[in-house]
From Swiss-Prot:
Zn(2+) binds at residues 911, 914, 931, 934. Monomer. It comes from Vibrio vulnificus (strain CMCP6). One of its GO terms (molecular function) is isoleucine-tRNA ligase activity. Its main location: cytoplasm. Keywords: Aminoacyl-tRNA synthetase, ATP-binding, Cytoplasm, Ligase, Metal-binding, Nucleotide-binding, Protein biosynthesis, Zinc. The gene is ileS. Its EC number is 6.1.1.5. It holds the Pfam family zf-FPG_IleRS. It catalyses: tRNA(Ile) + L-isoleucine + ATP = L-isoleucyl-tRNA(Ile) + AMP + diphosphate. It comes from the Bacteria. IleRS has two distinct active sites: one for aminoacylation and one for editing. The misactivated valine is translocated from the active site to the editing site, which sterically excludes the correctly activated isoleucine. The single editing site contains two valyl binding pockets, one specific for each substrate (Val-AMP or Val-tRNA(Ile)). This is Isoleucine--tRNA ligase. Binds 1 zinc ion per subunit.
Length: 948
């Protein structure tokens, strides 16, 4: 064999079998940034049609987690695939830099503003902290292979962005959507500030469930409203009963609310202490059961509408409250009568406005009752629940009391229960200028992926309250408004003043607002106006980046955002704040497509939790397996639902990666000695199987590009794996090894094969690039340096487009896709028999076998098209086809109807060069150890191959 070794075209490549990604990827990253890969992409795509994926900014606090990695990798895959599809797709990553979590971290270091440090110094410390967090997260994202404007990201704390956020506020005010109101808002007593809807999370809490009597102020007047049975009025006090799980709100009660069309029943409670109570008729039995009242009967009925404005005595204060009517009253639970405290609930507030009720707010920002709160002054509201219950008992107002577990709003940061509290706040009004209706209409023009996203956000917009955009915090963009000290009206020149403030902030940052003297801007008006000292909700900051970033950054060339891509929780967060602000400013949605992914869970479907010990950190994965494995995991998942990750799942991704890598390595190793400029074989002269392989690559490319266009990365990886493992690995690459290794060096048979391999790897490397970016770059650098045109290969795969050199089989080609599909089935059937022959020691390897195929006429006609090259497809030393009628006793049935196969061990000698067993080995003078085919490939013109 050694004497013929140099006549073989053995595979050779600098592309290693082992990826060793954890070690190699950082080296590749270094080169990408040294050679300005992102800049090269931008230059290559300048002037192309644009695709803008606007980055939802992660919060600048803490290390990135696996959810961040999922999100950023998905975005990067889409950006890179769009680039390969010929789009100019810049990526400007962003960060959310203001707000409470950063304040809390800084407070731990320097204390609260106004204690050891001034507010100005505190803001500067917050800015420094956020900047450090951004840098840490940035390096983590870069390590994942994500390309973008990392040297010029957007940060909501950049002076220019802060100024543009203020300008956005001005536009919303100009368009009539801003209002100031004294309204109940979500309030965290630990934060001491209002919370946005998106800052509230719901979890179970045990609360006191109480049924409370409100006695009738005028029994006779009340009874007159009921249709009484036979005129019997009954005996005992008359009370209407409310149900609540927030006893602490009773000091602020100003009404009891009924529904106009509900029927209410007057019940006589029998026994030693008779009394009469009023509840909704359909809930009467539930109330009686709950209160343990067994003996009672109905006295009469009245509609809710008939009881409107009837007066009832507050259970522990010396005033009466009216019965009012509201659509929010239901019979799902409770008594059908709702305790109404306009200062502590949005529905209560809304119905209270109709009846001009007092908006009582006896609770301070720290959750403690104010000093003038009768009976409960100085107590924290949640601790006061017990005190309220005791007071109700003392007053004889408590009908029933038990512990009740229910879903309750909590602060997303502190994980503590929150309250509704009426305070003066700034709102973006959903209805005063038709914002809600316009938003709902605009939703219809957006493509929501998955489709259920549309109904989800529609429901949220339909039901959401006014957007409270003010916060009582230090580190945030100021609500840069001047209001009249007496009327609280905005200054008439608000538009001009906002622009002046924005120009100063653009130069000096948000601190300029607190430093600026009102007289500098207002002149003589300064004495009548005061600065608003509240800051903006951070959801406003990120929500207006469609204006502050997309409209303003030169990278986007004035284009609007095509896509927003975030987790499904952002229907109530960024998608919504962006939509509302964009409608308020521009009258249209800020995006054309909204794509969402699910949350990351472990292999058992559980949330990531340090206490469970199931957290998968991106850094750990890249340090152990490499970023391309993490990227392949992301791409392989159906990300529209929950996305599972675990060591076992990542191991499966690593196995899939190895199969793809080994396929690519085979291609590269067998392009050894191939020069596309001089060695390409014309299509019509290629071996039939090679043409088929290129055609399969074209079919795969069409499906893969379509899947990329539809953001279906799961389908991309499935098709890629099928192509590498089944179409190539299990068939084509297996068949061509003999020809590639043993055919005449540089001869037609070998060059035809290499031409196919070259075309396919040119396509394959591009399919891989958006997902396995590091590996694609590694492959690219091992590919032939020159192109068929004689031009040099681009420095990076990412600057090009999908390969356009593939071709399908010609129309009317005899050995078409159906033919090769049938041959693969024949080969599969034969392989099972060869495997059995190996197991029973009839043969060693398949080249020691000679086959006789007994086939029916139709199948025989197809198989015979391969002529003498059938043996190369079946990987045996000899294969003949005979009619089924001549089937021998040795023939065995196969999975294919009309096909029997006889396997026997060959008696022919083995060729030292190709390892085939043929009768002519030892018969050729001077080449006694090799077969005639090999002699031709070594000394002659080389074997001719037409089919395989």
């Amino acid at each position: 064999m050694s004497e013929y070794k140099d006549t073989l075209n053995l595979p050779e490549t600098g592309f290693p079998m082992r990826g060793d990604l954890a070690k190699r990827e950082p080296e590749m990253l270094k080169r990408w940034y040294q050679e300005d890969l992102y800049g090269e992409i931008r230059k290559a795509k300048k002037g192309k049609k644009s695709f803008v994926l606007h980055d939802g900014p992660p919060y600048a606090n803490g290390d990135i987690h696996i959810g961040h990695a999922l999100n950023k990798i998905l975005k990067d895959i889409i950006i890179k695939s769009k680039t390969l599809s010929g789009f100019d797709a810049p990526y400007v990553p962003g960060w959310d830099c203001h707000g409470l979590p950063i304040e809390l971290m800084v407070e731990k270091k320097v204390g609260k503003p106004g204690q050891k440090v001034t507010a100005a110094e505190f803001r500067e410390k917050c800015r420094e902290y956020a900047a450090g967090q951004v840098e840490g997260q940035k390096e983590s994202f870069k390590r994942l292979g994500i390309m973008g404007e990392w040297d010029k990201p957007y940060r909501t704390m950049d002076f220019t962005t802060e100024a543009n956020i203020i300008r956005a506020l001005g536009q919303i005010a100009d368009n009539g959507h801003l209002l100031k109101g004294f309204k109940p808002v979500h309030w965290c007593t630990d934060c001491g500030s209002a919370l946005a809807e998106a800052e509230v999370e719901y979890k179970n809490k045990v609360s006191p469930s109480i049924d409370v009597r409100f006695k009738a102020a005028d029994e006779a007047a009340l009874l007159a409203k009921f249709s009484l049975n036979e005129g019997h009025q009954g005996q005992g006090d008359v009370s209407i009963v409310i149900w609540t799980t927030t006893p602490w709100t009773l000091p602020a009660n100003r009404a009891v609310c009924l529904r106009d069309d509900l029927e209410y029943v007057l019940i006589q409670v029998e026994g030693d202490n008779p009394e009469r109570i009023i509840v909704a008729a359909e809930l009467a039995k539930d109330v009686m059961d709950r209160a343990g009242i067994e003996h009672f009967h109905n006295l009469g009925f009245a509609k809710g509408a008939d009881l409107e404005l009837t007066q009832f005595q507050h259970p522990f204060y010396d005033f009466t409250v009216p019965a009012i009517l509201g659509d929010h009253v239901t019979t799902d639970s409770g008594t059908g009568v709702v305790h109404t405290a306009p200062g502590h609930g949005q529905e209560d507030f809304a119905v209270g406005q109709k009846y001009n009720l007092e908006v009582a707010n006896p609770v301070g920002s720290n959750g403690v009752y104010l000093p003038d709160t009768e009976l409960f002054a100085g107590q924290h509201v949640f601790k006061a629940n017990d005190a309220v219950v005791e007071t109700l008992k003392e007053k004889g107002a408590l009908l029933h009391h038990h512990a009740y577990e229910h879903s309750y709003p909590h602060c997303w940061r502190h994980k503590t229960p929150i309250i509704f509290r009426a305070t003066p706040q700034w709102f973006v009004s959903m209805d005063q200028a038709g914002l809600r209706a316009k938003a709902l209409e605009s939703i219809k023009g957006v493509q929501w992926m998955p489709e259920w996203g549309q109904s989800r956000i529609e429901g949220m917009i339909e039901g959401r309250p006014e957007w409270c955009i003010s916060r009582q915090r230090t580190w945030g963009v100021p609500i840069a408004l001047f209001v009249h000290k007496e009327t609280a009206e905005l200054h008439p020149n608000t538009s001009e003043l906002i622009e002046k403030v924005a120009q100063v902030v653009e130069q000096k940052g948000i601190q300029a607002w607190w430093d600026i003297d009102a007289a500098e801007l207002l002149g003589d008006d300064a004495a009548q106006y005061e600065k608003v000292l509240d800051t903006l909700d951070v959801w406003f900051d990120s929500g207006v980046t469609h204006y502050a970033v997309v409209d303003k950054r030169e990278e986007f060339n004035g284009a609007e955002a095509d896509m927003y891509l975030e987790g499904s929780d952002q229907h109530r967060g960024w998608f919504q704040s962006s939509l509302i602000s964009s409608i308020a400013m521009k009258g249209k949605a800020p995006y054309k497509q909204v794509l969402t992914h699910g949350f990351v869970v472990d292999g058992h479907g559980r949330k990531m939790s340090k206490s469970i010990g199931n957290v998968v950190a991106p850094k750990d994965v890249t340090n152990k397996l490499g970023a391309d494995i993490l990227r392949l995991w992301v791409a392989s998942t159906d990300y529209t639902g929950e996305v599972a990750v675990s060591d076992e799942i990542l191991k499966r991704s690593a196995d899939a990666y190895r199969r793809i890598r080994n396929t690519a390595r085979f291609f590269l190793a067998n392009l050894n000695g191939f020069n596309p400029e001089t060695d390409i074989v014309p299509v019509e002269e290629m071996v039939a199987l090679d043409r088929w392989a290129v055609g399969r690559a074209l079919a795969a490319q069409n499906e893969i590009v379509k899947a990329y266009d539809e953001y279906n990365t799961h389908a991309v990886t499935q098709r890629l794996m099928h192509f590498c493992s089944i179409e190539m690995g299990s068939f084509y690459l297996d068949v061509i090894k003999d020809r590639q290794y043993t055919a005449k060096l540089g001869g037609h048979a070998q060059r035809s094969c290499q031409t196919a391999l070259y075309y396919i790897v040119e396509a394959l490397v591009r399919w891989m690039a958006p997902i396995m970016s590091f590996t694609a770059d590694e492959i690219w650098n091992q590919m032939p340096a020159s192109l068929p045109s004689g031009e040099s290969r681009d420095k990076f795969v990412f600057t090009g487009e999908w390969f356009d050199g593939l071709f399908g089989l010609a129309e009317g080609e005899e050995l078409n896709n159906a033919f090769w599909s049938e041959m693969q089935k024949v080969r599969g059937a034969v392989n099972k028999l060869l495997e059995a022959a190996r197991s029973d020691k009839t043969i060693g390897g398949s080249l020691q076998a000679e086959l006789t195929l007994f086939a029916d006429d139709a199948l025989a006609a197809k198989i015979n098209k391969l002529e003498d090259e059938l043996r190369f497809v079946l990987l045996t030393s000899a294969a003949t086809v005979k009619p089924l009628s001549e089937k021998s006793d040795a023939a065995q049935a196969t999975d294919i109807e009309g096909l029997f196969v006889a396997v026997r061990a060959t008696e022919a000698e083995k060729c030292d060069r190709c390892w085939h067993h043929t009768p002519d080995v030892g018969t050729i003078e001077g080449h006694e150890k090799i077969c005639g085919r090999c002699v031709s490939n070594v000394d002659g013109e080389g074997e001719a191959r037409k089919f395989a």
